[in-house]
UniProtKB/Swiss-Prot annotation:
Residues that carry a glycan: N74, N256, N279, N444, N468, N484, N526
Cofactor: Cu cation
Organism expressing this protein natively: Metarhizium guizhouense (strain ARSEF 977)
Cell division in keyword set: no
Protein name: Laccase 1
Cofactor note: Binds 4 Cu cations per monomer.
Residues reported in the UniProt entry to bind Cu cation 4: H506, H509, C581, H586
EC number: 1.10.3.-
Subcellular localization(s) per the UniProt record: Cell surface
Pathway field: Pigment biosynthesis
One GO CC annotation: cell surface
Binding-site list for Cu cation 2: H80, H122, H582
Length: 613
């Protein structure tokens, strides 16, 4: 090698190292009493705080995180939205990539900080997300985003200001909260024979209150037409805003089990007890970044479907699930459990205190959530501004409804990737039909007609190390296998199983890769291929500008009409990846499936430190 060539190599290595640095983090997981909404219960703390610390890295950093389990129960940590390319052993999913971290033990996760954007991390052991292990992740990008910001403003100062604002955003981790731990909550359902999904609070950055505005107020806050379309005449919510637990429209069936609503403890469904505590306050400075502020929002909810709005402030939605999208302006946006949004807000209003309204917008419960956005220097305690949402999440005017983001409406959920990124047209190489719904009990959920994914499935023999462990067994119905380099279509059908024709929506999350939603329609999927469906229903498909995400809603009709969705992805990341509903009750009830992507190129050289003993 010549002296000049060696010099070039040294320079190249220098700049490569300048981009990629090693970042080491330590997370200590503990269990103790706390009262984030003013009412005490035991919960998970991470490094002594709740929610877990926000982690900020640069794209392509080498990340090394040591997790110490100082609880008396198992834990794992999943890095939601990170692709884990070439590091499937660090995905944090028990039974697929690792064994659970047992009490007193530790586990070291190593991976690249990729892709850039807004992500989050959370526990993935049983229903323990309910107990509070979740935090935001922000991976700052290397690339130029001028083309993204120029869709919002052509002003050069604005473009630079938005880039700076996005580099240093505000973080909102939004979660739902119950007075019961995850184990207690699940036991209520199995003891009573009823699916219970009534909550106490919506928290923002671990802060909130318990509101008891009265039953009549809550009844008036029901979404227009909800009772008429979905429930028997005269159905009323409780003083917590919850529908009666034993309604057939809620529980489905009939199931061959005994329903015991009398075994639901007091204050679960009704018997609201208010508590004054504190709501999160986000202080914003209109003198910085030309008056622009970016907010990264994590829907760390376990049941609720939340709606985000800030009084008197429009926002530009520019990122979903860590993927940049062509920005669109809204006044409110519905987020499903597991999703992440990034929004850009212009601070162009009178300095003051503006309420951030973040209610549950799903059909499960009328429940309000709040925080405050306060202009820096504002000394008044009085709130100001025009509300876009009511307590229960209803638009306050027809104009608000027209300018809101609804994931179940394709005209508003047309958020195409920036820069353009579309899937292969025509047929995929593989197609898999998954029929979702309930089987046997109100709390049992399946993704393939009948099989329930156990929460401890393959915990002792993770599929990364034993990919053929389920072959020739009934458990192989819980596993899909794909080939490396193939295009795959996942066809999801909802509301067709016996006893589950009025199924609630599901929030479907795939580990290891994002998917394009290329098709979506009402009815029963009875086509021999996606290609046939495209020919017969071309208006229900979009292969030119489909959205690209890792979490999608399966739309539903409250009246019971069936729906299907088609998700396409390219297999280039061999490993065992969980595909599941991000509603914790549904996953606990069995709504998951293991996808072994690239079985013909399975990881052979697993680092020694990750090898099983």
């Amino acid at each position: 090698m010549s002296r000049f060539a060696r010099l070039l190599l040294i320079v190249a290595l220098f700049f490569t190292g300048a981009w990629a640095k090693t970042v080491k983090e330590t997370l200590r997981i503990t269990w103790k009493e706390g009262a984030p909404n003013g009412q005490a219960r035991e919960l998970i703390y991470t490094n002594g705080q709740f929610p877990s610390p926000t982690l900020v890295w640069d794209e392509d950093d080498d990340i090394e995180i040591t997790v110490y389990n100082e609880m008396a129960k198992n834990v794992t940590v999943h890095w939601h939205g990170l692709d884990q390319k070439d590091t499937p052993w660090s995905d944090g999913t028990p039974g697929l990539s690792q064994r659970p971290i047992q009490p007193g033990n530790k586990f070291v996760y190593k991976f690249k900080a990729s892709p850039p954007g807004n992500h989050w991390y959370h526990s993935h052991e049983k229903m323990s997300l309910v107990d509070g292990l979740y935090g935001a992740i922000h991976i700052r990008p290397k690339g130029d985003r001028t083309g993204l910001w120029s869709q919002i403003s052509q002003d050069k100062d604005d473009i630079k200001a938005m880039e700076n604002a996005a580099h240093d955003p505000e973080y909102l981790v939004v979660s739902d909260w119950s007075q019961y731990t995850s184990e207690e909550y699940w036991k209520i359902s199995t003891d009573s024979g009823l699916l219970v999904f009534c909550l106490d609070s919506i928290l923002v950055n671990g802060k909130g209150e318990v509101y008891c505005p009265g039953q009549k107020f809550l009844q008036a806050e029901l979404a227009p037409g909800l009772v008429e379309d979905a429930f028997p005449p005269g159905t009323e919510v409780s003083d917590k805003g919850c529908f009666p637990a034993d309604l057939d429209q809620v529980q489905g069936g009939p199931w061959n089990i005994t329903k015991r609503p009398d075994l639901i403890p007091p204050r679960v469904q009704e018997g609201c007890v208010a508590s004054r505590h504190e709501n999160a306050t986000i202080v914003v400075d209109p003198s910085r970044n030309n008056g622009w502020v970016s907010m990264h929002i994590v829907a760390a909810a376990t049941i609720a479907q939340i709606t985000f709005s800030v009084d008197s402030h429009e926002f530009w939605l520019y990122e979903i699930d860590g993927n940049y999208v062509n920005p669109r302006k809204f006044v409110s946006a519905v987020m499903s459990a597991g999703e992440t949004f990034s929004v850009m807000i212009k601070l162009d209003q009178k300095p003051g205190r503006y309420t951030m309204r973040i209610p549950n917008s799903g059909a499960s419960q009328v429940l309000g959530g709040f925080a405050e956005m306060v202009y820096k220097g504002c000394e008044s305690e009085e709130k100001t501004g025009k509300a876009y949402l009511s307590y229960g999440g209803n638009p306050t005017s027809p104009d608000v409804e027209k300018n809101s983001f609804f994931p179940w409406q394709l005209d508003t959920d047309h958020m195409s990737p920036w820069p353009p990124n579309k899937p292969r047209p025509g047929n995929a190489d593989e197609e898999h039909l998954l029929v979702l719904g309930r089987v046997g009990a109100p709390y049992n959920y399946t993704m393939n007609t009948k099989y329930l994914y156990p929460v401890d499935f393959q915990n002792d023999d993770p599929l990364l190390f034993y990919p053929n462990a389920t072959r020739d067994t009934e458990n192989d119905g819980l596993v899909l296998r794909t080939k490396n380099g193939s295009w795959v279509d996942l066809i999801l059908q909802v509301s067709t199983l016996p006893g589950d024709t009025s199924s609630f929506e599901h929030f479907m999350h795939k580990h290891g890769s994002k998917t394009w939603r290329i098709g979506f329609g009402a009815g029963v999927w009875n086509y021999t291929s996606v290609e046939e469906a495209i020919k017969e229903r071309p208006k229900d498909f979009n292969l030119e500008t489909p959205g690209l995400r890792d979490t999608w809603i399966t739309a539903f009709s409250i009246g019971g009409e069936a729906y299907w969705s088609v998700f396409r992805y390219f297999v280039d990341n061999p490993g065992p990846w969980l595909f599941h509903c991000h509603i914790e009750l549904h996953l606990m009830g069995g709504m998951g499936i293991a996808i072994l992507d690239g079985v013909d190129a399975w990881p052979e050289h697993i680092p020694e430190e990750y090898q099983l003993c």
